[in-house]
Amino acid sequence: MNEEKAVVVFSGGQDSTTCLFWAKKQFAEVEAVTFDYGQRHRREIEVAASIADELGVRHTVLDMSLLGQLAPNALTRGEIAIEQKEGELPTTFVDGRNLLFLSFAAVLAKQRGARHIVTGVCETDFSGYPDCRDIFIKSLNVTLNLAMDYPFVIHTPLMWLTKAETWKLADELGALEFVRTKTLTCYNGVIADGCGECPACVLRKRGLEEYLQEKAGVKAR
């Protein structure tokens, strides 16, 4: 285990909760930071706080409501439909979100004496979000180090994993049922298996089914 501290960018969803369990295995001290950017469902912040409390992790919520004013999108405006038109980014994409979240997480991390930042962004199940790409994370890591003259390391344990492989990682961390029943991935604010219809729920369900089938096949051999 690394004896240093880490800050996890935390939404209370499948990916960031898996990352929180991963970080607790990797680092001696872990803190979670959640951003309030005017999400259409407030349960995300409540779920994140509940999970952090249950896992005994210090939790900070930062006000990023300005982001919702600057970048109207389906995650902050109920009147905007969740959809993706051919050749366009999904309406769930929030311009600048990961750029700002990671920048503010870095400021918090430095104040806490932590240099490790963990985020659940993933390029494999790429939804067209440019700020989930590995090249962006590496670029921002360099920029933050130069901007604050501090040796940050941004960790992306899910970057090259499919959703099925992310479920597998949660299982290996002993957190499969926890992640399955207590996290909030659904764009419509439904905990656990969600609404089953929004893009986030469909991706989550398909990944879980693929992993459970694979796991059953391995056991049957």
Curated annotation (Swiss-Prot):
Its cofactor is Zn(2+). Keywords: ATP-binding, Ligase, Metal-binding, Nucleotide-binding, Queuosine biosynthesis, Zinc. It catalyses: 7-carboxy-7-deazaguanine + NH4(+) + ATP = 7-cyano-7-deazaguanine + ADP + phosphate + H2O + H(+). One of its GO terms (molecular function) is ligase activity, forming carbon-nitrogen bonds. InterPro entries: QueC (IPR018317), Rossmann-like_a/b/a_fold (IPR014729). Its EC number is 6.3.4.20. ATP binds at F10, S11, G12, G13, Q14, D15, S16, T17, T18, C19, L20. Pathway: Purine metabolism; 7-cyano-7-deazaguanine biosynthesis. Signal peptide: none annotated. GO terms for biological process: queuosine biosynthetic process. SUPFAM superfamilies: Adenine nucleotide alpha hydrolases-like. It comes from the Bacteria. Binds 1 zinc ion per subunit. Zn(2+) binds at C186, C195, C198, C201. Homodimer. Catalyzes the ATP-dependent conversion of 7-carboxy-7-deazaguanine (CDG) to 7-cyano-7-deazaguanine (preQ(0)). PANTHER family: 7-CYANO-7-DEAZAGUANINE SYNTHASE. Belongs to the QueC family. This is 7-cyano-7-deazaguanine synthase. It comes from Geobacillus thermodenitrificans (strain NG80-2). The lineage of its organism: Bacteria, Bacillati, Bacillota, Bacilli, Bacillales.
